[in-house]
Swiss-Prot record:
Pfam families, A to Z: YscW
Signal peptide (UniProt feature, chain positions): 1-14
Domains (record comment): Displays a compact beta-sandwich fold with interdependent beta-sheets. Possesses a large patch of basic residues that could play a role in membrane recognition.
Protein name: Type 3 secretion system pilotin
Gene null: resulting phenotype: Deletion of the gene causes a diminution of T3SS needles, a decrease in secretion of T3SS proteins and affects the regulatory gene operon. It reduces T3SS activity toward eukaryotic cells. Mutant shows reduced virulence in a mouse pneumonia model.
InterPro entries the record matches: Pilotin (IPR039366), T3SS_Pilotin (IPR053740)
Function: Involved in the synthesis of the type III secretion system (T3SS), also called injectisome, which is used to inject bacterial effector proteins into eukaryotic host cells. Pilot protein that is required for the proper localization of the secretin PscC in the outer membrane. Necessary for full in vivo virulence.
Gene giving rise to this polypeptide: exsB
Length: 137
């Protein structure tokens, strides 16, 4: 009777794995008037690892005004790459075509300012750009 009770009370002892240190890649997105329309903002963070771009994080926001504050809280070991880049795309809700975008190098711990650049067809873009149709990142 005491043996099962001793086993039950003894149980297993484990220690939690040490927390990996985190860094923040963040800032604000602006540069385009939304003209009282609902928009979708897609941010993708890339790391260059051994000469190849790899998506390491992605965020989507539904917005009715800019600027928008964003942040990616990442474990340090995910930032093994040589450089970080942020691709930002704005499209209207219900319209898949990108209306404005930005592509820039970013750094952890820096308050980045992303300025969207309008496409020539802004605000009435309806067709996807070639890179959007093929799905290449």
């Amino acid at each position: 009777m005491l043996l099962p009770l001793a086993l039950l009370l003894g149980g297993c002892v484990s220690q939690p794995a040490p927390m990996s240190p985190k860094v923040t890649v963040g800032g604000s997105v602006g540069g385009v008037s939304l003209q009282a329309r609902q928009a979708q903002l897609r941010l993708r963070l890339y790391a260059v690892v051994q000469g190849r771009m790899q998506t390491i994080a992605e965020r989507r926001y539904r917005v009715s005004g800019l600027p928008l504050r964003y942040a990616f809280d990442l474990e340090v070991d995910r930032l093994e790459g040589e450089a970080l880049y942020l691709r930002t795309e704005l499209s209207w809700v219900g319209v898949a075509a990108v209306q404005a975008s930005a592509w820039q190098q970013v750094a952890a711990g820096v308050d980045e300012r992303v300025r969207l650049v309008r496409r020539d067809c802004f605000p009435n873009c309806t067709a996807a750009r070639p890179e959007e149709r093929s799905g290449n990142d």
